[in-house]
Every structure is written in C-alpha cells, then in structure tokens.
C-alpha cells in the first residue's frame, strides 16, 4: 500500500527505513534474546530483531498505520527539511530495531541466557536489566546522527532540538517496553541522576555503556541534555500539540509491544501468527504481555 498520497507526497517506504541490526552492533549473533522453555533452544538477538521488524511492519500494513504516520508528521513537525524528516522517520521506525539491543549486557547474557559472554564487562550497578540499556544505546545512536547532521548544516538548530525531543521520548518507550508507561519526567530525572525517588538506573546504565563503548571502540557516548532544559521544552508546547504527541507515543509503544509479543511467541511456539485481528484491541495484548512470564526475563 505504498501508493501516492492525494497531496502528491510519496508515502515513505517504511521497509527501506528499517536498519539491519548488524549495521548497529556486531554482537547480534553472539548474544541471545530468548531461551526456549526447556533451555535447549536459543534465539539470537539478530533473529529476534528480524522477527520483531517483520511483525511491526505487518501490523503497520494490516492496520494502514502509515496514514497515521503521515498525518502526525504533518500536524506535529510542520514544514521541515527532507533531511530532518528522514531522521525523524528513521528514528520512529527503528524503535523496534533497537528495543532489545541492551541484551548485550553481559550479566543479562550470563544470568538469563546462560551465555558466558564478555564477562570482563559485567556491570556493577544495573544487574541483568536490559530495557534501560537499550534506551541508552538508542539515545547514543540517534543523538549522534542528529548532532552530525546539525554539524554538517543539513538540519538547523530548531530541527535538531525537536528531533532530540523524539530521541528522548523514543528511548523512554524502549525503557518501558516491559512495564507500564509511567512518567516521562521520572525517566528523564533518572537519566540525569536527579531522580527524587532514588531510581537512577538510567544514569547507571549510561555510565556502564560509556565504559563498554570506550573499552571496545575508544569512542565517547553523546552527552545528554540537562533535566531542566528538557522539562522547559516540554512545558512550552500547546495542549493540542501535546495531545498529538501523547497519542503518537501510545501508538508507537503499542506497536512495539505487539510486535515483540508476536515475535517472542513465534520463537517459543515455533510458528508464525499472521492474524492481526486482535491488534484492534491492542490493550489486551499489552495486558497479556505484561502478565506473561516469558517477557519478564
């Protein structure tokens, strides 16, 4: 259904925007995403990511969600350069691609996947958690792309700021994909080490990833926004814009949860599910997902 839109804009080709995992990390085949019930079968991170991408794309197509994408882009982003639009689309589509990349946490591999991998880099403070590490990885990856585009003059300051808003929102979605969407502010405070409830797992994950990247690649991790700058940017928006944003965030969250659920079920049960009828009732999937022990690993 990649037809022309009535205003003559080409529908963006979602499939071509999906990044292969091996363009983002070299460890997709060395690290595992899931174990079978009897622990005899292991699903690599690469395999799980491909399955998630497949279901994500299929659901978007089956439900004609690309029209929502285009509408949101027009309403929220307004008039932006093609380059900024491309980065926005890349970031949106690849939430699903990077959502489990934090499973390269050596302690997740060891404790959950029974896989002794890079044990010299075992984190001290984040234990075997993976969602928050995925969130940091996602942020670093896309903030770098945004900073480079701005540095090259391909996007302007305003575009860069808005794209960064989305990088943070999307990393938040990733950090919550095994739990309820709670408070964006809570997440951001934790990233910057300023969480009033003492949950600074975001900062801890950032510090671990910084060490990991430095040791392996001698590369720094992108510096994060200050908490106040973030809160101010969010507070200045019109209510209408915030409503669009909230709906959009829920949609991407639901899509991620559904795709992950289908992909995990395919590995566990050994067959594909092409019936997306119940995706209409995406809340059921989210509830089923949150109460599903397979997903708690």
What is the predicted role of each segment?
Residues 2-7, 13-295:
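Accessory nucleic-acid engagement/destabilization modules that flank
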